[in-house]
Amino acid sequence: MAQLVESVMGLNVELSPMSTTGDQQADWSLQEKGGKGLFTKELEVALLEGRADLAVHSAKDLPTENPDGLVLSAFPVREDPRDVLVLNEQVKDPQILASGSPRRRAQLQKRFPQVSWKELRGNVETRLRKIAVQREADGTILAAAGLSRLGIKEYPGLTFNKLPIDEMVPSPGQAAIAIQVRSNELDKFSVLDHEETSRAVLLER
């Protein structure tokens, strides 16, 4: 994203990585605590306090309403919105799948009615290892865009299968990046917007 801002706007970008509540509480169930806002609050506070000029969010993690003084200025080009079914390569008929998402569970239950569900917390690498090596579940479902951004196309002991959208409808805003800014700088950063992506994500939200 820094490269996009530099190339399109001609600005020098200083990155300010931040850890959010959702990042820090790896043992929380997002469904119990409420997933929306857990990955955004700290970034929004930095914007409002003037410690940052723009915040880069995963669009699917954003609440539908912005805090007073903040707006979404742009949605750059979207990546692949599909979900990926990741299975241990020795598994043909999974019995235990890992996902905390009610959306993913409900849709995949039609394909695998025999499956029981559990949650695997941790980053993507940790979850892949828990399936490939530790066999804590037969598989999981991950976002294709997230795997792509991490450069993960394969993993020893696992198979990756992208699910058609008519079989697994993605989360609203999945694979899209949202740029949030202070309200008085909306026009300044709107040049980063990709019209087709913006229109689709706003309709989904």
Where are these regions (language model features)?
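A conserved helix-loop-strand patch within extracytoplasmic ligand-binding domains
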Residues: 59-62, 66-115, 166, 186
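Short, Asp-centered acidic motifs that coordinate Mg2+ and/or phosphate
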Residues: 52-56, 138-139
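Conserved beta-strand termini and adjacent loop/short-helix elements that scaffold enzyme active sites
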Residues: 16-18, 57, 75, 100, ...
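Short, structured active-site "lid" loops
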Residues: 27-54
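Small-molecule-sensing regulatory modules
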Residues: 1-32, 105, 110-205
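Short beta-strand segments
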Residues: 57-58, 98-100, 141-143, 180
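Short Gly/Pro-enriched turn/cap motifs at secondary-structure boundaries
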Residues: 36-37, 76, 167-170
